[in-house]
Regions:
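Glycine-rich flexible loops
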Residues: 1-180
Length: 180
């Protein structure tokens, strides 16, 4: 097993075992190098992750999914995107589905990405004036986005917002908050 995947398993289990970070095994993690992205398979729980619980995908194919023109119908688009992501798998015979947030992991510059739903943060993001509160707590160090449907829509919106943030601040945000 690659050292990077051992580290990814360790990171996944660390956050997965702490119920302050995840609810019912939710959230997802990934590692990427120049060629491949390993992302948590749908239906896997972070606290018990093993090597086979990650889907290895070809990044060049994921980029084609990101750049493809899809229908404007949100439901049809997500069905098409999920089918296209399955075609990115290095080992399709494993019959594992990549996380619906795979594209979000791909657009991040970081090698390791941890996407969680901590209860306390969910409470904050579901509250009135959540954007104002996030800015009060974290200043300009984080990126805040209003509600966006998960999957393709959120990846495209976050990618655009990240570019704007980087242009304004000259560096990436320390964290990204997506409203619920």
């Amino acid at each position: 097993m690659r050292e990077e995947i051992k580290k990814l398993i360790e990171i996944s289990r660390h956050f997965g075992k702490d119920k302050d970070y995840v609810v019912a095994g939710g959230g997802n993690t990934s590692f990427k190098n120049n060629e491949y992205l390993w992302v948590k398979a749908s239906g896997s729980n972070l606290d018990g992750m093993k090597e086979e619980d990650f889907v290895q995908l070809e990044r060049s194919k994921i980029q084609r999914v990101l750049n493809k023109s899809y229908t404007t119908d949100a439901i049809e688009r997500e069905i098409e995107v999920k089918k296209d992501l399955l075609k990115c798998a290095v080992y399709p015979e494993k019959n594992t589905r990549p996380s619906v947030e795979t594209l979000l992991h791909e657009i991040m510059d970081q090698d390791y990405v941890v996407h969680l739903h901590p209860t306390i943060i969910n409470g904050l993001l579901c509250s009135k004036n959540s954007e104002k509160k996030v800015k009060e707590l974290f200043n300009e160090e984080v990126l805040y986005l209003g509600y966006i449907d998960p999957g393709y829509s959120s990846a495209i919106a976050v990618e655009k917002a990240l570019q704007e943030f980087n242009n304004k601040h000259g560096k990436p945000p320390r964290a990204i908050f997506l409203e619920h």
